């Protein structure tokens, strides 16, 4: 029994979450660049899922899907890093609510150690974009 994930199912769940996030960010009116960043994240995930190799063994299949999920979360955290209006907090709240839905076969369930869920699997790589943004900001402040 191999792992079968529908790309439409993944996008439906993510689209609902992103719509809620974008609505909350739009209400603040100050983080317009977030829209482009999050849509780029969604498109990149879509490209990866569309070009996903279907003939992998089950373990490799799951690792591949989870790496796409990790990349998506790193991308969203990076897109939200410049927005100081609480969008990152809303994103974290959405992730927690999504996990609580307990949808069988969700990426939170399938990838429990990924950047999208608590765990140790990719803790450092998920933190790396935030570190880079922090260091870039610090560097700019030092130069001024």
Curated annotation (Swiss-Prot):
Give the membrane topology, semicolon-separated if more than one: Lipid-anchor; GPI-anchor
Question: What cystine linkages occur within this chain?
Answer: none
Principal location listed in the UniProt entry: membrane
Q: Spell out the subcellular localization from the entry.
A: Cell membrane
Residue ranges that the Swiss-Prot or TrEMBL entry lists as coiled coil: none
Tissue specificity, in the record's words, reads: Expressed in sensory regions of the brain including the visual, auditory and olfactory systems. Within the retina, only expressed in the retinal ganglion cells. Concentrated in axon tracts including retinal axons.
- Please give the sites of covalent lipid attachment annotated as GPI-anchor amidated serine: 114
Record family assignment: Belongs to the neuritin family.
Give the protein's biological function. Modulates postsynaptic dendritic arbor elaboration and synaptic maturation.
Q: What is this protein called?
A: Neuritin-A
